[in-house]
């Protein structure tokens, strides 16, 4: 253990939560975090808005009905990323460089494995889940297309969220927000290009979202590759450290399960709406997508 961590945390984007009055620092930390959460939720909302305005009600139903399914499948891993943030923050407070390195090494590999697990799960489970939910036949194929393309980007989504967890553990909630703003602009512009310019419909908004997620992942990885030690990413050091993984899961899994429970209720509601047909799904998607 050494105290070199505190000497390396003077960057302007980082908030030192260990010294000085807390109220202002909590606000400076929490407001960008809340804005980041809102921007991530808006990704699907932008997809819904574009297809609803430029494609039609069936496409709107196909995209909008997927929001609770996406939440259900990824919330557990979002909780694990919260656990990662908590344990790295704890090591920073203890000024334990070695444990920070071990935790970040573990986080890197967990992000990679969870991303590819979700990618495969999305390809295999998309049609069975949407069929089980009673998605109408005239919507089902487009809904499956959207969900499968969306889940091709899961490695990027996991890379961003776990990378953001590392930055947030350092007291930096601003740079993840800046990255999400850039990705949001990319997503919106590509949505319009692919839907209006290329006529790609539902597939177009899914591809646009995937590219935007790739942009956010690339940017956050570049930031972390340039961080000072012990926070720098090293691809050749990816390794699961059992103690760090256990701590991460102990904190993160309950948070993830809590998010999944909320998503399950949304899936049940969506299944009920599906029984009324495509027009009902489109109407509810336009109204309820912001709630998800």
Predicted regions and their residues:
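Small-residue-rich hydrophobic transmembrane alpha-helices
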Residues: 60-120, 157-176, 270, 283-292
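Functionally critical, cavity-lining and gating residues within the transmembrane helices
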Residues: 43-44, 78-82, 122, 160-161, ...
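Helix-terminus/linker motif at the lipid-water interface of multi-pass membrane proteins
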Residues: 38, 42-61, 130-137, 193-200, ...
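Alpha-helical transmembrane segments of multi-pass membrane transporters/permeases
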Residues: 111, 166-189, 207-210
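Residue-level signature of transmembrane alpha-helical cores of multipass secondary-active transporters
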Residues: 29, 33-37, 71, 111, ...
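Short alpha-helical transmembrane segments in multi-pass integral membrane proteins
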Residues: 1-30, 88-155, 186, 197-253
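Transmembrane alpha-helix boundary and packing residues in multipass membrane permease domains
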Residues: 33, 37, 49, 86, ...
């Amino acid at each position: 253990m050494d105290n070199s961590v505190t000497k390396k945390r003077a960057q302007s984007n980082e908030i030192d939560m260990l010294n000085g009055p807390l109220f202002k620092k909590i606000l400076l930390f929490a407001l960008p975090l809340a804005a980041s959460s809102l921007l991530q939720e808006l990704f699907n909302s932008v997809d819904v808005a574009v297809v609803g305005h430029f494609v039609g009600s069936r496409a709107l139903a196909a995209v909008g009905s997927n929001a609770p399914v996406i939440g259900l499948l990824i919330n557990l891993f979002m909780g694990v990323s919260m656990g990662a943030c908590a344990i790295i923050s704890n090591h920073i407070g203890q000024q334990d460089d070695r444990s920070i390195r071990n935790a970040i090494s573990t986080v890197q590999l967990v992000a990679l494995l969870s991303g590819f697990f979700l990618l495969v799960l999305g390809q295999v489970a998309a049609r069975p889940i949407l069929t089980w939910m009673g998605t109408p036949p005239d919507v089902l194929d487009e809904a499956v297309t959207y969900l499968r393309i969306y889940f091709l980007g899961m490695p990027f989504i996991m890379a961003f969220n776990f990378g953001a967890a590392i930055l947030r553990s350092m007291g930096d909630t601003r740079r993840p927000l800046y990255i999400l703003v850039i990705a949001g602009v990319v997503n919106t512009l590509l949505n319009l290009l692919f839907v209006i310019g290329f006529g790609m419909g539902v597939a177009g908004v899914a591809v646009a979202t995937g590219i935007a997620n790739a942009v956010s992942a690339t940017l956050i990885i570049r930031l972390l590759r340039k961080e000072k030690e012990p926070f720098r990413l090293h691809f050749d050091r990816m390794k699961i450290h059992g103690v760090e993984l256990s701590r991460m899961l102990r904190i993160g899994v309950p948070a993830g399960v809590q998010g999944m429970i909320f998503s399950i209720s949304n899936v049940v509601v969506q299944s009920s709406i599906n029984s009324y047909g495509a027009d009902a799904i489109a109407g509810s998607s336009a109204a309820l997508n912001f709630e998800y």
